[in-house]
Every structure is written in structure tokens, then in C-alpha cells.
């Protein structure tokens, strides 16, 4: 078909409408109409044409012909060489004329693009070209793709820095760099560096990983022969003991396989922050880094000290990231006036703390932990005013800390009439179980500047509404409320979730995450980036394995080589679209032959088939289930309606208030109503009409908030056009979306946001995302990204483990159990094994408790689980023991974990297994099957104690979790004494079985040694109550066993009957 004929025939009219998005097809720069497809002339606008080429099938929706590249448009893979590369290169990168026009922009308080009113920050599009900018409406229909790079700047410092790094890497000769003074050559070098990947995968060296895999296979073979030997050689004089031990060993083998297979191909990753800066943060241009919203959650400020929460917030506000792209939301689920006043003081102190951190680039940027460091703080500091300003800042922080302590002391005793705010009005949250929603914006509005006149990141206090009779779903419900509030106020495309006791230890942590999330290829497939948890304030020997190094440095790296690490509840950067239940984009295979390769008589068949292909392609990001499918289909039309609607009307509503009334937002007149949408259908074509009617399905899924629904359709982040015109109306809309009844009859907690149904909502939420096909990434920068506090006290540590295990049991008993959920989906098999291991590990406590009891029983009764310890049995036992040691040693070799950390992990696996995990199994069964709810308590976070750094370590707190391990220790000690005494007094036929029994008993006690040491505390004595309970249980067990004596056959003699003879 002739292109000219198409152009003249199809575009005689002055205006043509794009058949994809419904917008007008704009003319080209030379005034001629834009024709996307030269074969059929199907009307498609330039933005849709470029998006289809970069993200879609690259084919025309009507004739299925592959789109050819138009001059000035970015290249994609598969484009033919048209001989105009050099001209396009100069035109795309604009080396000669870097200037361009910027559209006017009016500053708005809650605008995520710009707050200075000078020029809007460029928006970033996930998965878009690496060096491109986008402007225009939020719908993406009017977006005009800009040039991939703008040249003409000197950037001398960056060039020198780049040359130095390249010389160190051996990629650049020093002589060449000295001679290369030409400006254009420097620019081309920067272009080449900026186009390099932002990250790379670093596999484990084969010299370390291959022996590890070989030993795993050998251990599996040895394990099979060992189990065969154990099953085929029963102990006839102790069948119950033998049967119990074999069942335990079979379970341990299955548990080991589930734990070992996901660690088959571990990987590590490294990032390139300099390339990120060259690509998205170039000097003299608006920053194009993606905005991010921080979420901090807290429940009880008396258990979670406000000074710790304040330090977390301060470290967020001082993060090394553009201030207009950072927002911090603090969720107060306890509606505490103490936290409200604390954040007010924190916002005031941040005006001095944030510029101090950025001026001297200090780390960490949490003042409590920065000033408590026992290091040379003058190292690498060259500013002469640093010492003086640091001394002044430390004094100001101490004064700030005293004010916070005064607030805490005041909050200890609540007045009878309730708390009263400074203006004399009663505090709305006096009743923590019945109060309205509250929102307060401290920073981020105009006028909230630091002492140097620079802007500060946004800081927002949020306390969701609570009413009797509603299930608030604890932390998961609070996080979902923050998702909705942030979407209404800022709507950043990424969300970083932190616990209140986890501060930002690496100010560049967000940039580390953006190296993955803003990557051209990987970013659009990622649901979250997970950072490892690191802790402060742990004793040097880590008695109770609080650091959990084995999990974070071994298991998580193994998962990163499959589909990604699990979500661990904090230190995670989420893709907002993944939280909304959308599927990741599905890569479609390009057809080997297109229409222009077939004869003309086949074109109609191809077009018919292409129609189906185009239809299926529209649902590229369908929801996770239920009504989630097809959410992308009405996106363009619905956004077009909001855009046209915003030109006529603005958001209504009165002035913003701190707290909504008892009916909250229900009386508030919203700007977009469903009735108005239905009335506005007249005059639209069929495509737009069907798109607008899908508003009802959106409300069933996301809730009845048109502003929030519109924000979910903006993939790039940012507020819908016109929504930011009235900040007061946005506050009222935000109060509406945190009302207690908002989630009724919606998909929140089921398919959207944090998933309900378990106290470990983190595991469930990550599992749902991976089932949809999303991937996650494990980021381990050299400097820990975040650090938190861990419960170093034995009782608190066991209660923490109890809560985790209880959540796993709840997931096991739910429909989301990995054993039977989402088969046929996009969850990889090894990833399913890993999730299965995370929910079945509490059940290991039952065979573990039995196996730790068997050695003592054998010593008390003189029986053994093995009939005869012959040479073959000895070989299998020794081979299994050596394979376990070899696996552990090689695992430490490739992971870098110390042997002490590995041994502490093994010890606490036994301690937690026979205590917290055991209780979690029974509590979980009672909760799920019997309906008996077990309320979990928040683990207390102790503030820093300068008098005794580890005073909490020796503090004893009574809990029933201490009884089973103590009983095991006493039983095994009694068994050792009884076994040795019996051998000495009565002799022993064979010392081999005796040594085997003694070895197993000592092995149990050795694993429980940290627990025993914790019971003794500082005074080296076990609490009386624990001793009494344990001795009582051990005595009852021993007496019953001796009385029954099940392994000694009853003597059967002749039956005596009266014979009638006197004898």
C-alpha cells in the first residue's frame, strides 16, 4: 500500500482521534499529519505509538504489521538500520542545542512534582527509556517523548571522577585520559557511562559454590541410605522409642530439604550510584528521580519510646535524596497525644538537624546513634567549623531529648477528664478504641523551611478512625490506611516501610533501591526491594541469635537467585502498583513473521488474529484475582474523563481540620461523584462510555473515593491533574479514606495492600505478590541501609519468636497456604518450597521435643533406638555427621558468615523449637479451629541506657515458655547421672551404646546452654519458680515411666489352679 495514498485518504479531516486513548492525533513538527502505520493508516497518536513500540507488541492493532521507526523517535530492539544513525543521535541527544521550553507550573502545597514554583520536576515512567523525560497529563495520553539526553554541559568534576574510577577498573588508559581534552569526547564518554546498567548480579565463585552443591548431593544420598538403615533395622526391645525416633528423623529430613533447595543458586548484587546520578540527576536540569513515601508505624509510645521514633523520623527527613521527592507518614495506631506532641517537637528540631547532616555528610543521621558512636568523628572532616557546629548541635539535641522526656513523664498519668490540646480543645483520641481519623501535616507546606532557608521533606501524622464493632486488622490495617492517605496527598510510585525502631543508617539507601526500581528492564517487574535487617545494642556473643545472620546472609541470598527474597516486614521499598494488586507486565513473544512477510491474501487472517492479540494485550496488568482482572483496560478513557472534568470543576470542600467528625467525611461534598460520571457519559463514544462505566467496578475494588481511584491509575506517580488545586479538600479526602468503614465490601486486605489473616502479614503480602508473577530483589550495600533494636532479653526474644511462629501456623491453616494455593500461577517451584518452609517450621517443634527427650529416656531405661551398633551402622552415623559438618562449613565459606553466628543460630533453633514454636502450634490450632483469639503484645523497645548497656540481657521475666526447655535440661542431666551410675554399679555389657546415649544427651544440653545461662542471669542462679516447675514435671515423668516400664516384658509363668490335693 502506498504511504502517500494513506496519508491523503485517511487524514483529509482537520482532526483525527486516536483509537487507543481517545485523544486527538497531533500533527508532526513539519505540519504533516502523523501516521503510525504506513500499511493501513490506523489512527494512533504519537505517545501511544511510542509506548506500543517500547512496551507492547510493536505491531499495529488493526493489521498486525510491525511499526517502523519514525525519525526523531527512540530506537527499540529490532529496528532496521536506516542509515540515519548519526543525524538521529545528534537530534535525540541535542548536543548542539540543549535548551528547551518548559510548560508553566503553579506551585501547590501537596504537589509531588515541584514546590518551588519555578519549573516542574520531570516524571519518571517505570520501564521507560533510561534517559528520557515525560511531561504532560498524568494519563499519559498527551505525553510527548523528549530527547533521551541533553548535552552541552561541562561537568568537569564528574568527568574527572569518572576517569579515575575507570582507570582503577582498568577500562581506561591513563595516557588516553590525559590526552583526551576535547569537550565532545568527554560528553560521549559520559553518555557511554550513563547508558551502562545501574546494577549487576554477582554470582558466587564456582570454586566456592560447586563444592557446596556436591556436598549437598552427597548428603542427600547419605541421608537416604541412613533412613533406609533406620527403617529396616528396628529395635525389637524398644519398638515405641525406635518408631518415634524414625518418625522424627523423617520429618527432619523433609525439613532440611525444604530449607536447603532454595539455597542452591545464591547471588549477590552491586549497584552503581554514580550512573544513577548521571542518568536521572544531571547538573543544570530538573531531577528525574522517582518520588518515594516513607511509612513509619507505631502502636504504643509507652512501649516504643518516642525518642526512638523521633530518631527514625529525623533520619528519614535527612536522607540523601531530593527533598521535594521525600514524604514521611507516621501511623499512630494508639491515637496518642504523646506521639503527636513528639512529632511537633521533632519537626522543629529537624529545621536545624537536617542542614547539619547534609552540610557535613554525617552517618548515621539519627542523632541518638550518631552522638553515641565510639569512633573518631573527626576522620575525613576538613571543614574548620565542624567541631564548633557539632558541639552546638549535640547540645541542642540534648535539650530536645529533655523536652521529649518531659512529655513522656507527663503522659504517665492520664487526667480524669482526658488530654487537652494546647488550644484548649479536648484531644480527639482520648478513647483509643473509639475516635475519629486524624491527620496533621507538620512539614512540606510553604513556609516550612530549615534554618538555612531550604525546603524540608513532608512530614504527616496519621491516626486512622476506630469505632467499636469494626475489625481494624492491627498493623496490616494501619499500613493500608497509610497507602490510601499517601495516594491522596502525594502518590509517590514507591513506598518504603520502616518500623518505628528502625532508623536510616545509610543516607543513600533510597538511591541503592532506585538502581533496581528505575532500571529499564528490571524495574517494571519488581514488586519490592528488600534490605537486610541489622541491629544495634546486641551483646558481643549474640546469645539468642538476635542478628539472625544465617537467615539474612544465606537464605535470603539463595532466594534472590530464584524469584526474590521474602518480605520481612521492614526495610522494604515497594512498587505501589504491586500493592494495588496489579500483575506485572507479561512479555509477549514477537511473531516470527508479520503481515508484510505473508502474501496479500493472508492479510485478512492476520488482521483477524491480530485483533484477538490486541485485546488480550490490553489486560497486561490485570488484578491478582476476583475483579482485579482487566483493570488496565479502562485506564485511558477514565483518566481522559478526569482530565477534561478537571478543566471545568475543582475539588470542593471547606477548610482542613485536624480530625474528622464522628461521621468523618460522609458529609463532605466530594469533587467527583458516581452520578456525575454517569451524567457525563452523553457525548462520548462507545469506548469512553464503557471505560467510564467501569468506575463502579473500581469502587468495588478500591473503595468509594474517586480521587484515590484516579491516583491508582497514574502509574508514574503524582496526583491526578487538577486534584492538587485545593489542599484543604485533599485533607478531607484523606480523612475519608482512613474511616473505619471504608474497606467494607472492597478488596483491601484480600487482594490489595497488606493482606489480612495472619499476625505475620509481611509473609502473606510478599507471597501474594510473588504468586502474581512479581519479582523481588535483595539489596545488601556495604554500609547497612537500616538498623534497629532487638529484644536481647530471653523472655522478650521468645515472645517475639512466638508471634512469628503463630503467624506461620495461621497461614498454614488458611487458604493462602503455599502447599495448595495459586497452582498454575507464576510462582516458581523453588520459591514455593521456601514459602512452604516458612509456614511449616513451627510444626518441627513436636518431633524436636520428642527427639530431645529420647536420649534421657534411653539412659533411664537402659534401652536404645538402635538394636546393635555394628560397623555398618557406625559408618552411616559418621558419614551423616560429617556431611552435616561439611555442608555447614562450605555454607559459611561462600556466605561469609562466622562460625559463631552459625552455631548460635543452631542453638536458638533448638531453644525456640522446644518453647516458642511448640506453644505457637497449640495456640494457632486453638485460634483457627476453636476460635480462641490470642492477643499478641508489642515487644518493648528499650531506650539507650548509658549506665548498663546490657542490663536488659540479665533481666528475668517469668513466662511459661521457659518451662519446656528447663524440663528438658533437668531430664537429660538426670538421665546422664542415672546411666553412668548404673554402668558403674552393675557393669555394662557394651560401652558403645552407652557412649552413644551420653553423646546425644550432652548434645541436647549443649544446644540448650544459652538458655541455661539466661536462666541463671547475673546472679548465676536459676529462679526458684522455674526450678520448682521443672523438677515437678521431671519427677512426674520419671515416676510414671518407672511405674509403667513399657520396655520390660511382663513375666509369664505357669497358671496355678487348685488341684484338690493338700500339699
From Swiss-Prot:
The chain crosses the membrane at residues 214-234, 238-258, 846-866, 872-892, 908-928, 960-980, 992-1012, 1022-1042. It comes from Oryza sativa subsp. japonica (Rice). Belongs to the glycosyltransferase 2 family. Plant cellulose synthase subfamily. One of its GO terms (biological process) is cellulose biosynthetic process. This is Cellulose synthase A catalytic subunit 7 [UDP-forming]. Its cofactor is Mn(2+); Zn(2+). Binds 2 Zn(2+) ions per subunit. The active site is at residues 333, 762. The gene is CESA7. Its EC number is 2.4.1.12. Its main location: membrane. Residues 116-154 are annotated as: Disordered. It is a multi-pass membrane protein. Pfam families: Cellulose_synt, zf-UDP. Pathway: Glycan metabolism; plant cellulose biosynthesis. Keywords: Cell membrane, Cell wall biogenesis/degradation, Cellulose biosynthesis, Coiled coil, Glycoprotein, Glycosyltransferase, Manganese, Membrane, Metal-binding, Transferase, Transmembrane, Transmembrane helix, Zinc, Zinc-finger. UDP-alpha-D-glucose binds at residues 297, 303-304, 333, 474.
Amino acid at each position: 500500500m502506498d504511504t502517500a495514498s494513506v496519508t491523503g485518504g485517511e487524514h483529509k479531516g482537520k482532526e483525527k482521534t486516536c483509537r487507543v486513548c481517545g485523544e486527538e492525533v497531533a500533527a508532526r513538527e513539519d505540519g504533516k499529519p502523523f501516521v503510525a502505520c504506513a500499511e493501513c493508516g490506523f489512527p494512533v497518536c504519537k505517545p501511544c505509538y511510542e509506548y506500543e513500540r517500547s512496551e507492547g507488541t510493536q505491531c499495529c492493532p488493526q493489521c498486525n504489521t510491525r511499526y517502523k521507526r519514525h525519525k526523531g523517535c527512540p530506537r527499540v530492539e529490532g529496528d532496521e538500520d536506516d542509515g540515519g544513525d548519526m543525524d538521529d543521535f545528534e537530534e535525540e541527544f541535542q548536543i548542539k542545542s540543549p535548551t528547551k521550553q518548559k510548560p508553566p507550573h503553579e506551585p501547590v502545597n501537596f504537589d509531588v512534582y515541584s514546590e518551588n514554583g519555578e519549573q516542574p520536576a520531570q516524571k519518571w515512567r517505570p520501564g521507560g527509556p533510561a534517559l528520557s523525560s515525560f511531561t504532560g497529563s498524568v494519563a499519559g495520553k498527551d505525553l510527548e517523548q523528549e530527547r533521551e539526553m541533553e548535552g552541552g554541559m561541562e561537568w568537569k568534576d564528574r568527568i574527572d571522577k569518572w576517569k579515575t574510577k575507570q582507570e582503577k577498573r582498568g577500562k581506561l588508559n591513563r595516557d588516553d585520559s590525559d590526552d583526551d581534552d576535547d569537550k565532545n569526547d568527554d560528553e560521549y564518554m559520559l553518555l557511554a557511562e550513563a547508558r551502562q546498567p545501574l546494577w549487576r548480579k554477582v554470582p558466587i565463585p564456582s570454586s566456592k559454590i560447586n563444592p557446596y552443591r556436591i556436598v549437598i548431593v552427597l548428603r542427600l544420598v547419605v541421608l537416604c541410605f541412613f533412613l533406609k538403615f533406620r527403617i529396616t533395622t528396628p529395635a525389637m526391645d524398644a519398638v515405641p522409642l525406635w518408631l518415634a525416633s524414625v518418625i522424627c528423623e523423617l520429618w527432619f529430613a523433609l525439613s532440611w530439604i525444604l530449607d536447603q533447595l532454595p539455597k542452591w543458586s545464591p547471588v549477590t548484587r552491586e549497584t552503581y550510584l554514580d550512573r544513577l546520578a548521571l542518568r536521572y540527576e544531571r547538573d543544570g536540569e530538573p531531577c528525574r528521580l522517582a518520588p518515594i513515601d516513607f511509612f513509619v508505624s507505631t502502636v504504643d509510645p509507652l512501649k516504643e519510646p518516642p525518642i526512638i521514633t523521633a530518631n527514625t523520623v529525623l533520619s528519614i527527613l535527612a536522607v540523601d535524596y531530593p527533598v521535594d521527592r521525600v514524604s514521611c507518614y507516621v501511623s499512630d495506631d494508639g491515637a496518642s497525644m504523646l506521639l503527636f506532641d513528639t512529632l511537633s517537637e521533632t519537626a522543629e528540631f529537624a529545621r536545624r538537624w537536617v542542614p547539619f547532616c547534609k552540610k557535613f555528610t554525617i552517618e548515621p543521621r539519627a542523632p541518638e546513634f550518631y552522638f553515641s558512636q565510639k569512633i573518631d568523628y573527626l576522620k575525613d572532616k576538613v571543614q574548620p567549623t565542624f567541631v564548633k557546629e557539632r558541639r552546638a548541635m549535640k547540645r541542642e539535641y540534648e535539650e530536645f531529648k529533655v523536652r521529649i522526656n518531659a512529655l513522656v513523664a507527663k503522659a504517665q498519668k492520664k487526667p480524669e477528664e482526658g488530654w487537652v490540646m494546647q488550644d484548649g480543645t479536648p484531644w480527639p483520641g482520648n478513647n483509643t478504641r473509639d475516635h475519629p481519623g486524624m491527620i496533621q501535616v507538620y512539614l512540606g507546606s510553604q513556609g516550612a523551611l530549615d534554618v538555612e532557608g531550604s525546603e524540608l521533606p513532608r512530614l504527616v501524622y496519621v491516626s486512622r478512625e476506630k469505632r467499636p464493632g469494626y475489625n481494624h486488622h492491627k498493623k496490616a490495617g494501619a499500613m493500608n490506611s497509610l497507602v490510601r492517605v499517601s495516594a491522596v496527598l502525594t502518590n509517590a510510585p514507591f513506598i518504603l516501610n520502616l518500623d518505628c525502631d528502625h532508623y536510616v543508617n545509610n543516607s543513600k539507601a533510597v538511591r541503592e533501591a532506585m538502581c533496581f526500581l528505575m532500571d529499564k528492564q528490571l524495574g517494571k517487574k519488581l514488586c519490592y526491594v528488600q534490605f537486610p535487617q541489622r541491629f544495634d545494642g546486641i551483646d558481643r556473643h549474640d546469645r539468642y541469635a538476635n542478628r539472625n545472620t544465617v537467615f539474612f546472609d544465606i537464605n535470603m541470598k539463595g532466594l534472590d537467585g530464584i524469584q526474590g527474597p521474602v518480605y520481612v516486614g521492614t526495610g522494604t521499598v515497594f512498587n505501589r502498583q504491586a500493592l494495588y494488586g496489579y500483575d506485572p507486565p507479561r512479555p509477549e513473544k514477537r511473531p516470527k513473521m508479520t503481515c508484510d512477510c505473508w502474501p496479500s491474501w493472508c492479510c485478512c487472517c492476520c488482521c483477524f488474529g491480530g485483533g484477538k492479540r490486541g485485546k488480550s494485550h490490553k489486560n497486561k496488568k490485570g488484578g491478582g484475582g476476583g475483579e482485579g482482572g482487566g483493570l488496565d483496560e479502562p485506564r485511558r478513557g477514565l483518566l481522559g474523563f478526569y482530565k477534561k472534568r478537571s478543566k471545568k470543576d475543582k475539588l470542593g470542600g471547606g477548610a482542613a481540620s485536624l480530625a474528622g467528625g464522628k461521621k468523618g467525611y460522609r458529609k463532605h461534598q466530594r469533587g467527583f461523584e458516581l452520578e456525575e460520571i454517569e451524567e457525563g457519559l452523553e457525548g462520548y463514544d462507545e469506548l469512553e462510555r464503557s471505560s467510564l462505566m467501569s468506575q463502579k467496578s473500581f469502587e468495588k475494588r478500591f473503595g468509594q473515593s474517586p480521587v484515590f481511584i484516579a491516583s491508582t491509575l497514574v502509574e508514574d506517580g503524582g496526583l491526578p491533574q487538577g486534584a492538587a488545586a485545593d489542599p484543604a479538600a485533599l485533607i478531607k479526602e484523606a480523612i475519608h479514606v482512613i474511616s473505619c468503614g471504608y474497606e467494607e465490601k472492597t478488596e483491601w486486605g484480600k487482594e490489595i495492600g497488606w493482606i489480612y489473616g495472619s499476625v505475620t502479614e509481611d509473609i502473606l503480602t510478599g507471597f501474594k505478590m510473588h504468586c502474581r508473577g512479581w519479582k523481588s530483589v535483595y539489596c545488601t550495600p556495604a554500609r547497612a541501609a537500616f538498623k534497629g533494636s532487638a529484644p536481647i532479653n530471653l523472655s522478650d526474644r521468645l515472645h517475639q519468636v512466638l508471634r512469628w511462629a503463630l503467624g506461620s501456623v495461621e497461614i498454614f491453616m488458611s487458604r493462602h497456604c503455599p502447599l495448595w494455593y495459586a497452582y498454575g500461577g507464576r510462582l516458581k517451584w523453588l520459591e514455593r518450597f521456601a514459602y512452604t518452609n516458612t509456614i511449616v517450621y513451627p510444626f518441627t517443634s513436636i518431633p524436636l521435643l520428642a527427639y530431645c527427650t529420647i536420649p534421657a529416656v534411653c539412659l533411664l531405661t537402659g534401652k536404645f533406638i538402635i538394636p546393635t551398633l555394628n560397623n555398618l551402622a557406625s559408618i552411616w552415623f559418621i558419614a551423616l555427621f560429617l556431611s552435616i559438618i561439611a555442608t555447614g562449613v562450605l555454607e559459611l565459606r561462600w556466605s561469609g558468615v562466622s562460625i559463631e553466628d552459625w552455631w548460635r543460630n543452631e542453638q536458638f533453633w533448638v531453644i525456640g523449637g522446644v518453647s516458642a514454636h511448640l506453644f505457637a502450634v497449640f495456640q494457632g490450632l486453638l485460634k483457627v479451629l476453636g476460635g480462641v483469639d490470642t492477643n499478641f503484645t508489642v515487644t518493648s523497645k528499650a531506650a539507650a541506657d548509658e549506665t548498663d548497656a546490657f542490663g536488659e540481657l540479665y533481666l528475668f521475666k517469668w513466662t511459661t515458655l521457659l518451662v519446656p526447655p528447663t524440663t528438658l535440661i533437668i531430664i537429660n542431666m538426670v538421665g546422664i547421672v542415672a546411666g553412668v551410675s548404673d554402668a558403674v554399679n552393675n557393669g555394662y555389657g557394651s560401652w558403645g551404646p552407652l557412649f552413644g546415649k551420653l553423646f546425644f544427651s550432652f548434645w541436647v544440653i549443649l544446644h540448650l546452654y544459652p538458655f541455661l545461662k539466661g536462666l541463671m542471669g547475673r546472679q548465676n542462679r536459676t529462679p526458684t519458680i522455674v526450678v520448682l516447675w521443672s523438677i515437678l514435671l521431671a519427677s512426674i515423668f520419671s515416676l510414671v515411666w518407672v511405674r509403667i516400664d513399657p520396655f520390660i516384658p511382663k513375666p509369664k509363668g505357669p497358671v496355678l489352679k487348685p488341684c484338690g490335693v493338700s500339699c
